[in-house]
């Protein structure tokens, strides 16, 4: 989309933060209004993360106005809220390409702009990185400032508190801003509290506070009295005791939509020494009523009509794999009150909304705490319950030690329902589910299943749920299922594949939902086709039979080729001293950027024609 300077006259003056800082402070509210309208206009035309960015407009403007970015280093946690940041840092005219193939990255990305200090996508990394950046800046001795912006969801993760605990110990000069959008602005966020925030962030208060500590450090009764008096005064309006105990100077909460107030507070805080903590209150979806009323639905949106405020309904195709999982969960819970379902803050995405409403006593959203989710599930299993951990492939990476140490070593019957496996699409490198088969396959006693359609997905969930000899995992992709008939639930024989087509010379061994593409390729090649179903344990007898009857084998999976299911087939053949040529087809050895799922698969060659051509070229 072309930029309309007449529609956004103030924003038109800002193509860099240097230009932003030339504006008179009085014009910043108008700039915020135009920036918010431009964000609505661009995202509604192109799709993307939406409600979070609407809530951080004033904060973004104030930060770039006060701090000398990119010299001063600004770090966004996760990055959903960083669209206004991208617009103000030279990417305004390309914002309509965000999340598209060849377009702007969906999150702050180091390779895209010098303003993007840390590449992000997963939550709760900003403070840890910020401490390292602040320590490096201090050694540089150029008065470079470090600011981290983290949301109220991301700060619940253990990593954020580990980082703050460390910051309180080594005391780097840095600012952590908590963007708290869980509630509307409360009554105590008004003129009095904004005035107090500026007072508490001012140099006079800081000097008196530190000076008083030094003067009275050797007079314990007076020091304790001063501490209690300070806590009493601040406690009337400041819910920051926890952050103070971690070693931060806490300021807030303040109105995150008062851009002029934010500018004043940030100016006061910029030169303070040691770790500072600013708590701001914002409203997710601010300035666009439909998003304010339903920020979860408007968190990430397709193209939509901003006038009506209604998002396009699903085209009515087949249900998603997430819904297939959610329906199975409800069906199982209706018969078994031992089922316990766990999600790390992904209720909607994992298809668990209906389950959470029907079976609230069996549903646990542990927030952004993947490590805790897995070990919590281990505890439930020890207690005689049957835990199901619903988690995205990319987020299970964050709990790898817990899978090994707390579940697998103890052979606890925990079922992992791994959503978003394989190519995810528009969220790019940080969200592709490329590695789960590789990092789970090496864990002893782990059963790993790869359904080829929704019926197999249900059967495998049922099989894993009733498997009591250790952990099991079922991985399925983002997107709609195929529309096959759903059969009555029954346990599958562990580690057994199914021959789908008999052919000559070449056998295709498929793992997962690429079976339709593999079927077309097998027909074109007159190849044998097998739905392997299990990555672990592999059907070794079937592999050896296929190797004995064919000149070559081809493995197909939507996982990294290195260490994936195909590698397991190679290992079986080598161990059995059966040196048959094997072609492993899967995800290449690089991080896959944003684009649609179809675009990514076409580029990689995971289409029917792509698979066929790869095999023909290899055999030639």
From Swiss-Prot:
An example molecular function term from Gene Ontology annotations: 1-deoxy-D-xylulose-5-phosphate synthase activity
Keywords attached to this entry: Isoprene biosynthesis, Magnesium, Metal-binding, Thiamine biosynthesis, Thiamine pyrophosphate, Transferase
Listed pathway(s): Metabolic intermediate biosynthesis; 1-deoxy-D-xylulose 5-phosphate biosynthesis; 1-deoxy-D-xylulose 5-phosphate from D-glyceraldehyde 3-phosphate and pyruvate: step 1/1
Highest rank taxon of the organism: Bacteria
Ranges in coiled-coil conformation: none
EC number of the protein: 2.2.1.7
Pfam families found in the cross-reference section: DXP_synthase_N (PF13292), Transket_pyr (PF02779), Transketolase_C (PF02780)
Annotated thiamine diphosphate binding sites: 80, 121-123, 153-154, 181, 288, 370
One record GO biological process: thiamine biosynthetic process
Binding sites annotated in the UniProt record for Mg(2+): 152, 181
Record protein name field: 1-deoxy-D-xylulose-5-phosphate synthase
NCBIfam families tied to this protein: dxs (TIGR00204), PRK05444.2-2 (NF003933)
Quaternary structure (record): Homodimer.
Similarity-based family: Belongs to the transketolase family. DXPS subfamily.
Signal peptide: none
Any GO CC annotation of this UniProt entry: cytosol
Taxonomic lineage: Bacteria, Pseudomonadati, Pseudomonadota, Gammaproteobacteria, Enterobacterales
């Amino acid at each position: 989309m072309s930029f309309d300077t007449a529609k956004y006259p103030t924003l038109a003056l800002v193509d860099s933060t240097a230009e932003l800082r030339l504006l008179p402070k009085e014009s910043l509210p108008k700039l915020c209004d135009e920036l918010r309208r431009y964000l609505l206009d661009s995202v509604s035309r192109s799709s993307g993360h939406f409600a979070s960015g609407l809530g951080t407009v004033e904060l973004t403007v104030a930060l770039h106005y006060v701090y000398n970015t990119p010299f001063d280093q600004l770090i966004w946690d996760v990055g959903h809220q960083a669209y206004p940041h991208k617009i103000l840092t030279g990417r305004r005219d390309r914002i309509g390409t965000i999340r598209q193939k060849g377009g702007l990255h969906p999150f702050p990305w180091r390779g895209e702009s010098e303003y993007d200090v840390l590449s992000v996508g997963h939550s709760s990394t900003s403070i840890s990185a910020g401490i390292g950046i602040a320590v490096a800046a201090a050694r540089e001795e150029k008065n470079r400032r470090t600011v981290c912006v983290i949301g109220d969801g991301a700060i619940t993760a253990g990593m954020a508190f580990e980082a703050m605990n460390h910051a309180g110990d080594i005391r780097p000069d840095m600012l952590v801003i908590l963007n708290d959008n869980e509630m509307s602005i409360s009554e105590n966020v008004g003129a009095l509290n904004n005035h107090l925030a500026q007072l508490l962030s001012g140099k006079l208060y800081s000097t008196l506070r530190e000076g008083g500590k030094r003067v009275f450090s050797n007079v314990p009764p007076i020091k304790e009295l001063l501490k209690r008096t300070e806590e009493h005064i601040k406690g009337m309006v400041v819910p920051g005791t926890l952050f103070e105990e971690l070693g931060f100077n806490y300021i807030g909460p303040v109105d995150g939509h008062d851009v002029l107030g934010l500018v004043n507070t940030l100016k006061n805080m910029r030169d303070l020494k040691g770790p500072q903590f600013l708590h701001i209150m914002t409203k997710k979806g601010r300035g666009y009523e439909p998003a304010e009323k339903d920020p979860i639905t408007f968190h990430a949106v397709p193209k939509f009509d901003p006038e009506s405020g209604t998002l396009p309904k699903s085209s009515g195709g087949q249900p998603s794999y997430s819904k297939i999982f959610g329906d199975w969960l409800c069906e199982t819970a209706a018969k078994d009150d031992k089922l316990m379902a766990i999600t790390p803050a992904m209720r909607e995405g994992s298809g668990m909304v209906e389950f959470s409403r029907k079976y609230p006593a069996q549903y646990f959203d542990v927030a952004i705490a993947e490590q805790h989710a897995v070990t919590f599930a281990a505890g439930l299993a020890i207690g005689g319950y049957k835990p199901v951990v619903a988690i995205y492939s990319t987020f299970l990476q964050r709990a790898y030690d817990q899978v090994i140490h707390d579940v697998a070593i103890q052979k606890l019957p925990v079922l992992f329902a791994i959503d978003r496996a394989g190519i995810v699409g528009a969220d790019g490198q940080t969200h592709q589910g490329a590695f789960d088969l590789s990092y789970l396959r090496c864990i002893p006693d782990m059963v790993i299943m790869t359904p080829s359609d929704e019926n197999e997905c249900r059967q495998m969930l049922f099989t894993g749920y009733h498997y009591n000899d250790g952990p099991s995992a079922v991985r399925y992709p983002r997107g709609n299922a195929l529309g096959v008939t759903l059969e009555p639930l029954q346990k599958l024989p562990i580690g057994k594949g199914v021959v789908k087509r008999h052919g000559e010379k070449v056998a295709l061994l498929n793992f997962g939902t690429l079976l339709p593409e593999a079927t077309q390729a097998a027909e074109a090649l007159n190849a044998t086709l097998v739905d392997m179903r299990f990555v672990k344990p592999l059907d070794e007898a079937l592999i050896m039979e296929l190797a004995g009857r064919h000149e070559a084998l081809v493995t197909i999976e939507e996982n990294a080729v290195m260490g994936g299911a195909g590698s397991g087939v190679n290992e079986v053949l080598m161990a059995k001293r059966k040196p048959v040529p094997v072609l492993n087809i899967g995800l290449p050895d690089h991080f896959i950027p944003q684009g649609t799922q179809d675009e990514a698969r076409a580029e990689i060659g995971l289409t029917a024609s792509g698979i066929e051509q790869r095999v023909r070229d290899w055999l030639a």
